[in-house]
C-alpha cells in the first residue's frame, strides 16, 4: 500500500509586509515538498478569542497584526493560480460555507477556478459555523437543512447543461435560472464534504467525492462515520468505495518535545481547544466551558469574549483535550500519531498551527519539522 496522499493548508491571514506573505511562503513550501494540494479556509473571522491576540500570548502578532483579518478564499486561490506556475497543485477550500454563500455563487466560483486552473479545483463544503453566519444576519436555526438544499442546488445547476432550471426549495428556489459555465473536459470540481452528525453523513453519502471532516475525533470514530457515509452512498445507488476518505488535521511541532509542550501550554493553542465538543472534554474528565453538550466549533462565538473571560475558559481546559485535538510532537512523534489513521484515511490535509505560541522564533522554526512530517507521510 502506498503512503498517504497529502495536502497542506494555510489560514490566509492578512500578514506583513504584504498581505499574502505567509500564504505565499506556505504555498512555495508545499510545492517544494511535492504535496498533492493546497487548501485555504472560508472564514470571516477566526475560531479563537481575538482578545488573546496580544504579543504576551503570541509572538506571531508581529507578523499578523489583526487576527480576524482573514482574506477571501476564492480570490486568494485565483491569485495563487495566476502567480505560481510551478507545482500545479490542486487548489481547494477547506471548507466553504453553505450558509452565508448562495449556492449559485459557490457553483460559479468553483467552476471558474476549475476552468482557469485546467481542472485543479476542489470544492470543500460544509454547513459552516455559527460565528460566520449569525453575526452577519444569516439564520442559523437549520444549518443542515440549508446545506442539503445548497448541495441539491449546486448539482441542479451543474447538471443543467445551460438549460433553464426550476426547482422548489425552502432556502434556494430556482425560477428560470441559468448556469452556462461548462465543466473542464467534462468534469466538475470534486466535492469534499465536512460532516459529523448522522444527517450530514447521509448528505455526504449522497453528494461527496470525498468525506473530509476536521476538528477533534478519534480514528475509531472516523471509521464509524465513514461506514455511515458509504452506507448512505450505497442507498442512493452510488459506489460507496469511490468516496475518498480524507481528513484535515492541525499540527503543533518543534525541534524537541520540550518545545512542543511549551507551545501546547500557550494560551492561544489551549484556547484552540474550545473548538472541541463536550464529548472530547468528557473523555478527559472535564466539561466544556460553554456548557454540557456544547458542540464545539460549529456553535462557538469567540470574537466577543473579553480577555479575562477567555483566560477563565482556557484555565479549565484539560491538557488532554488539546493533545487529542491536535497532532503534536516532534516530527517522528507526529508521524507515529498520523500512522494511527492509516487504516481508515487515505488523504490527509495538514495545517501547521505551531506559530500560535508565545515564542515567535520557535513558531517559525517549526517549519523544518513540519516539512519532514509532510514528506514522510507520503511514504507511510
UniProtKB/Swiss-Prot annotation:
This is Phthiodiolone/phenolphthiodiolone dimycocerosates ketoreductase. The keyword Lipid metabolism applies. Belongs to the mer family. Phthiodiolone/phenolphthiodiolone dimycocerosates ketoreductase subfamily. SUPFAM superfamilies: Bacterial luciferase-like (SSF51679). It comes from Mycobacterium sp. (strain JLS). Keywords: Lipid biosynthesis, Lipid metabolism, Oxidoreductase. GO terms for biological process: lipid metabolic process. InterPro entries: F420-G6PD/mer, Luciferase-like_dom, Luciferase-like_sf. Catalyzes the reduction of the keto moiety of phthiodiolone dimycocerosates (DIM B) and glycosylated phenolphthiodiolone dimycocerosates to form the intermediate compounds phthiotriol and glycosylated phenolphthiotriol dimycocerosates during phthiocerol dimycocerosates (DIM A) and glycosylated phenolphthiocerol dimycocerosates (PGL) biosynthesis. One of its GO terms (molecular function) is oxidoreductase activity, acting on paired donors, with incorporation or reduction of molecular oxygen. Its EC number is 1.2.-.-. The keyword Oxidoreductase applies.
